[in-house]
Structure formats: structure tokens, C-alpha cells
Design a protein with these regions (language model features):
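Non-catalytic accessory segments flanking enzyme active sites
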Residues: 1-23, 121, 140-225, 252, ...
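Short beta-strand element of the alpha/beta-hydrolase
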Residues: 220, 228-238
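Short loop/turn segments that connect beta-strands within beta-propeller blades
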Residues: 38-42, 89-93, 134-138, 176-180
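A flexible loop/linker signature enriched in serine peptidases of the S9 family
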Residues: 1-3, 18-33, 47-60, 71-86, ...
């Protein structure tokens, strides 16, 4: 946890903190509760949210100390449930929802000095805007968007926040609490940004699974020239309840591919966050059909809309669930791809159900345990389609990954080698589910970029 997991009461003699006390059930429980404790240690912590068996977190006191605001999920065992903002009267223990008008999960929480307004961020249609919520009636007012607001602090009638975009790392901005008079107060890395060639980006929309609207982004190569065609990097996000949108990342950043001369396509398929909870829920039990249909339709739409995309030179890349999808399309949609990149992806969903440290995740997504409903785990299991694999694949795996353990990546590479498919394995002994160390990140990008260029530029295998 971090500082958002606890809050001091205004009187300074007690605090509330979020903790999961699950014993041996911790691996399949998402039941975090809020406990109130005095600092003198004379009384045991009191569970304020024992009635909710799902996730309770992010406590914030009202200025008078009489009300506790916090974020809460409703469905036990579902880590991607919607976080609602709740208000609890501490004297009575009664709680009500404040954010009913927001259909997306609240990401963070702060309160105004007068106790009348809550501030929160939430993913929304490929971005992460900042909202002000009237505590009395729940009315939400948009304060800032045009990118992703990650952090914010309230001071008097102003809000200081960071915002990043697909073409800028985080910068500091200041706005009035009503969203007016926004101004930028920092230009971090000014010289580096000025010297960097950026790929222009655009959001697009198409009709996907169930005749519903689906969104995506295209990023032009940094060296874009009108009339030319460019190879494609088709990025598939993880989660699967996640999003690739208008925000900056020091891991999967589309500008790194645009800078190498690739055009980038990213689809927020069914299951993505920021499009309402029903949209997010739709992927559970459907890992291999609904999102695949969106990816196929989104790819076709992008090819038709953006004539600079060269479909004869395309590679698909993904991590975590994105890596699962790379394995899945290797056996179910191989035709468009010159190469694939699978980072920490699931190879065998049934084995994943026994090996991951997040049992709640696989059990929710598959509707039960692998011994109770094995057929659910096999329905969209990439291992059952290896016989159809043929596309060259780079496999990346962290040996400290307990989310999707190393045997998944090693098994993927073994299958590729056994089938005599051109493949490479990049194994990081000191990384977990993410590549976090700077030198390892450089090696990751160098290896991935070389792999993409090898298969999209006509170079002979080495």
C-alpha cells in the first residue's frame, strides 16, 4: 500500500487504514476492510466495513471528522469491479454512495477544505480526467482532461495536478476548483521534448462485438511523410481490464515504436476500462472471442481509414493478457502478422489457475476453480491451438513473475522451438511482471525493436 491506504482523523488521535486479513484465503480474497484505531493503543482496531466482503480502501475524513469517505467495490473476488465513492457517518455506521452518476471506477480521492466537494480521477474513453463531485447531490463536474491526470492535491480553492499525454510525460498544472483558469506551471524535460520527434496521434471509433462502439488510437510514425506507407506495430493491452489511451508510460509507450518508423494501432476491446462497468464486465468468461472480434474489426477499420498503414508489414505485441492474446491469435488469427511479441503472457490457462499468486483473478474470470469448472479454463486455452502456430514469435519473461509465472513463457518458447518456428527468448532473472530496471528496459526495447524490424524490413534471419 501507500499513503492513500490510511488517513488521520482531524483530531489527530486516531486513524483509519485499509488492510486485508484473510489468512490462508488471501490468494483468493479481495476483502480489504477499513479499520479505525486510536494511537494510544488502548483498544483493538474496529472494522468499519465488515458488512462488505469486497474491497474497501482510500479513506478520507471530512474536515469535522464526522464522515469518512472511501472507495468501495461490491462484488467479492472481482478486482476489476467498479470503485464507488462512499460516505459513512461514523457515529451510526450508515453508508451511502456519493458517485452514483459516474459509471467508471473512481481512481483516487481528496476533499475540499469546506467539506462540500470531493475530487477524483476516473478512466473515461481513453483518457483519465479529473472530476469534482458535489457531496450532497453527487453531481460530477469535469475539471480537466485532454490526457491522463495521475496525481492531484487540493489547496484552498485550487487544485494542483499532473497530466501526461501520448506526446508528453507528466507536467504540473493548476486549476481553480471549478475547472476554470487552468494553466501549466512546469515544463519538465523542456529541451529533451523539443529535440524529440513525436508521432501524431488520433482516436478512432468503430462498431465491434455486439454492434457496440469500440474505441482505439492510431499513432503515426515520427518520420511520417504524406503518401508513404509504414509498417504496423499492433499493441494489445493487458489487464485485461485495462486501457491503451492518451497517456504516457515508461514501459509500453507507443512513441517508442513511432520513433522507430512504425505506425501504431491500439484497440480498447470489450473488457477495457473507461467505457462503463458493463463494458468492462463483458470480457469475463470470454477471453478469446469478444475481444478477438474487436481486435479484428478494429484492425480492419484502421486499415481502411488510414491509408499510410502497410498491412503487408505488421506485427502484434502484448504483455500479460496482451501476451495471452498474442498466444491466442497465433493459433486463431495468424494471417495478418509477420511476427509476434509475447511478454509474460499466459500459455496454459488451466495451469495458470494453479500457479498464479492471484487466484481470485483466474477464478473470477473463469467462473470458478480449475478443478470445479475445468471446461471453462479450456474454452479459450492457447495451449490447445499450438498445432496451428506458424508466425515467428519473441517471448519475454521475468523470472520473478508470480502473476504469470516463468513456466508459462518457457513453455511458449518450447512449443515454438519444438515446432521449428523462428523464435527467441529474452529472460530477465531480476524482473517480475514488469521490466523496471533502466538497463533492462533498454535491452527490452533494443531486442523488441530489432525483432520487429527483422520481420518487417525484409532482412534475412540471423
Amino acid at each position: 500500500g501507500d499513503a492513500s491506504e490510511y488517513a488521520w482523523a482531524p483530531e489527530g488521535k486516531s486513524l483509519v487504514f485499509s488492510v486485508r486479513i484473510a489468512g490462508k484465503t488471501e490468494a483468493w480474497s479481495t476483502n480489504f476492510d477499513l479499520y479505525h484505531v486510536t494511537v494510544d493503543g488502548k483498544a483493538a482496531p474496529r472494522n468499519l466495513t465488515a458488512g462488505n466482503k469486497a474491497w474497501d480502501t482510500s479513506p478520507v475524513f471530512s474536515p469535522d471528522g464526522k464522515t469518512l469517505f472511501y472507495r468501495a467495490m461490491k462484488r467479492p473476488g472481482f478486482e476489476a469491479d467498479r470503485f464507488a465513492i462512499m460516505a459513512m457517518e461514523l457515529a451510526s455506521g450508515k453508508a451511502r454512495e456519493v458517485s452514483a452518476r459516474l459509471d467508471n471506477a473512481a481512481e483516487s480521492l481528496a476533499i475540499s477544505g469546506d467539506g462540500k466537494t470531493l475530487f477524483t480521477t476516473t478512466q473515461d474513453t481513453g483518457e483519465m480526467p479529473l472530476f469534482a463531485i458535489d457531496i450532497t447531490n453527487g453531481e460530477a463536474t469535469l475539471l480537466a482532461r485532454d490526457g491522463s491526470v495521475r496525481e492531484f492535491a487540493v489547496a484552498g480553492d485550487q487544485v494542483l495536478f499532473t497530466r501526461d499525454r501520448l506526446d508528453s510525460p507528466a507536467q504540473l498544472f493548476l486549476t481553480d476548483a471549478d475547472g476554470r483558469s487552468e494553466r501549466q506551471v512546469s515544463v519538465n524535460n523542456r529541451d529533451a521534448i523539443a529535440k524529440t520527434a513525436w508521432g501524431a496521434f488520433e482516436q478512432f471509433q468503430f462498431i465491434g462485438w455486439n454492434n457496440e462502439s469500440v474505441h482505439g488510437y492510431v499513432v503515426k510514425p515520427a518520420n511520417y511523410v504524406e503518401g508513404r506507407k509504414y509498417p504496423i506495430a499492433f499493441l494489445i493491452h493487458g489487464g485485461p481490464q485495462g486501457s491503451f489511451g492518451n497517456g504516457w508510460s515508461y514501459r509500453w509507450n507507443p512513441q517508442t515504436y513511432a520513433g522507430q518508423g512504425f505506425a501504431v494501432i491500439m484497440i480498447d476491446f470489450h473488457g477495457s476500462t473507461g467505457y462503463g462497468q458493463a463494458f468492462t464486465d463483458s470480457i469475463s468468461g470470454h477471453w478469446g472471442d469478444r475481444p478477438l472480434e474487436d481486435l479484428q474489426k478494429g484492425y480492419a477499420h484502421a486499415l481502411e481509414k488510414y491509408r499510410f498503414l502497410d498491412s503487408s508489414r505488421a506485427c502484434a505485441l502484448g504483455a500479460s493478457y496482451g501476451g495471452y492474446m498474442v498466444n491466442w491469435i497465433a493459433g486463431n488469427w495468424p494471417e495478418p502478422w509477420k511476427c509476434l511479441v509475447n511478454h509474460d503472457g499466459v500459455f496454459d490457462t488451466r495451469m495458470m489457475g494453479y500457479a498464479t499468486e492471484e487466484l481470485w483473478f483466474t477464478e473470477w474470470e473463469n467462473g470458478g476453480t480449475p478443478f470445479d469448472v475445468p471446461q471453462n479454463y479450456e474454452k479459450f486455452n492457447p495451449v490447445n491451438h499450438v498445432a496451428k502456430w506458424s508466425v515467428p514469435m519473441l517471448v519475454v519473461q521475468g523470472e520473478l513473475d508470480y502473476r504469470i509465472p516463468p513456466e508459462q513463457g518457457i513453455a511458449t518458447f518450447t512449443a515454438l522451438q519444438r515446432k521449428d518456428i523462428e523464435s527467441q527468448l529474452l529472460l530477465f532473472p531480476d524482473e517480475n511482471h514488469w521490466v523496471l530496471k533502466p538497463q533492462n528496459s533498454i535491452q527490452w526495447h533494443d531486442t523488441v525493436n530489432h525483432w520487429l524490424k527483422r520481420w518487417t524490413s525484409g532482412e534475412q534471419p540471423q
